[in-house]
Amino acid sequence: MASPDLSLFTYPNETPFVELDCLAAFNALTDKEKLYAHYLSQASWYGGLIVYVQTSPEAPLIFSLIHKLVTAESVEDLKKTAIESGKATEDDVKALLVYISGILANSGNYKGFGDSKIVPNLPKERLENIILTSAAHKADPKAIETLWNACADKIYSLEHSHQHLGFGDKGTTTYFTPNCTLKDSELVGNFMKKYNLEGYNNRLFKYEDDGKTTYEVRMASVLNQQDDEPFLMKDTIYEGCTFRVTRGDYSGLLELVCQNLEKAKEYASNDLESNMLEQYIKSFRTGSLDAHKSGSTYWIKNKGPVVETYIGFIETYRDPAGMRGEFEGFVAMVNKEMSAKFGTLVAHAESLLKELPWPSTFEKDQFLKPDYTSLDVLTFSGSGIPAGINIPNYDEIRQSEGFKNVSLGNVIPTSFKGFRHQFLSEADVAMMDKFAVTAFEVNVGLHELLGHGSGKLFRKEGDQYNFDVETVINPLTNSKVTSWYEAGDTYDSKFTSLGSAYEECRAECVGLYLSLNQDVLKIFGTEGVEAENVMYTTWLNMLWAGSAKALEMYSPASKKWLQSHSQARYVILQVCLEAGEDFVKVTETEPGKNLLLSVDRSKIKTVGKKAIGDFLVKLQVYKSTGDVKSAQEMFNKYSEVSDDGAYPWARWRSIILAHKQPRQIMVQHNTKVNGNTVEISKYPATAEGFVQSWSERFSSSKVESLLESLWQKDAKYFYAEPPAKLSAAC
């Protein structure tokens, strides 16, 4: 078997770093608001360390090792000592700093966008040399060597099952033990549905106990099994297996989260914020998902806060079963000027929903107008920073209470800095350079508010339906609806691993479809010729992402898509290519070297609108009715990467990879309490600045030992041979 292409798994030394600036917004806060933001940020950063435990068996140790390295001495001293030793070059040290940055930016050694492994861009022996000359090693050689020996091989391993996230037989995950397969996931999913459990805040451990297969559903909580407070349920026999619901996952880290949320509560601006934080604390303390839902309800009702935040086990993209949430937390300040535009969009939402191509019976009975704000991010912890969010993800709350939309205003322009658009004509490159930021703001606004915020799920609870089963007609069959969500079903539990890419595709299509509306473009400050250019750029950018970027996130070996948004955009491209009439074309202009994407802008409002509209009807009908089989068949067809025909994407992937640009890493601020005020720190947009920001991030010295103890607790489930104790390092 050929060796894997290392460029797919490394961050090159020229990886760009950009500053996520929010100084003006933060400095405009009152002292009380700054203290509120600070403690929420601390809670988010401590909680973000949970993602290392959720990513791979070795990730907690990698964090502990690199954190010891960068806190024992300055980056400059680390670099100077390594180079002067003669055992490492300046390029070696740069490669290490970029690797460390990649690990910290993704909260683990797998990319948050693409799920592929991150390995160092320098030989193992050179990395070891730098570690052995470090101040951390001089201070405690036994601890550093113990950590290095425990994770060195895993850091560099590119065995097939280590290259990407996935179930244990095909990939790496710690949401499940390695002996779990898709069949185990389905069995556990059925058990959880029967007993009204959801997967957001748990992991699954499979083992033998007294000769019987046992599935341990371990809930995230501060409290452990031995604590007296009543818990969920006793051991249960289901399908001949023992199911054991336990708690105490990530206990020490969640304790630090709760401590900081308690402090933040002292500076809350109203009862809604206090109640919200109280419920989050209860959820993280006990493992109660209902408490987090209650906190989310208070959060929705807290309209237009000056400091916005959300925290918990949220997005399910990286669980191979699509049910378990990765921890994330964000803290941000409202950008009033851009928020006013989103407020106007919300005011027009009900009329815009009527323009969507599915029948009104497939839309929610009542549109619950959400809070929609543009935010300047102070803190975003997790495996990546998105441009926009539509939360909470709990179906029942979204249908009954509503949701919030946030556009991360300082993320959008930052993400376009220094970017080159390949595979386009010079005229289209100029168009993208001029209008891409505005077009992306339009797309994000529509995607979050009316994409994720639209559509009804048909449900049956007991003998009651939430739709008229006698009169509602399926527009694809012209007959009555014959499928729906039963009691205990959620979108995630039914659509599982398909769910994320499918829903992102639906939201992206809504954004494209409604970007043709002149009133929408006017809301975002564009009219006339400029509005037409923004509309064209919105479509061009989506189709460019589907052709020029998406296949970076596809694995030919496993024929698996590695990232939901990339798969969604590729699918949209295929739908538009299928529409014909020379609306969209991709040609190989230089054999084996270059491609050209062209979009006939005169056909967007005709051919393009019809293609996306017809596709949207299918997407929504299958989602509303819970028709997973039809959804899967359709989505798989458009997701196929063929190596022949007019568009041999499998062959063209090598051309796309040859033009690949390294993904940016965003440098975030830190805050620190000084008396009754909060100081904010700014760092250079370099690998050195990024690493320094992390070396100064945590006020508690316990983070390394907590992650090491969590690794030790789980090690027997993830290693064939029991690993060495880390007592020397703890």
What are these regions (language model features)?
Residues A2-D77:
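N-terminal-proximal low-complexity accessory segments that begin disordered
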Residues T30, N270, A439-E461, A507-E508, ...:
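Active-site recognition of the HExxH zinc-binding catalytic motif
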Residues S44, L69-E73, K265-A268, L272, ...:
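A generic secondary-structure signal for well-formed alpha-helical elements
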Residues V51, T490-C505, C509-Y622:
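Long, well-structured alpha-helical subdomains associated
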Residues K79, I83, D271-E278, E461-F467, ...:
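Short, glycine/acidic-rich hinge or "gate" loops at secondary-structure transitions
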Residues L97-S101, N106-N224, D228, E239-F440:
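Contiguous, non-catalytic segments that form substrate-binding/exosite surfaces or channel walls
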Residues G455-E503:
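Post-HEXXH active-site segment of zinc metalloproteases
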Residues L596-C730:
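Extended, compositionally biased alpha-helical segments that mediate assembly or anchoring
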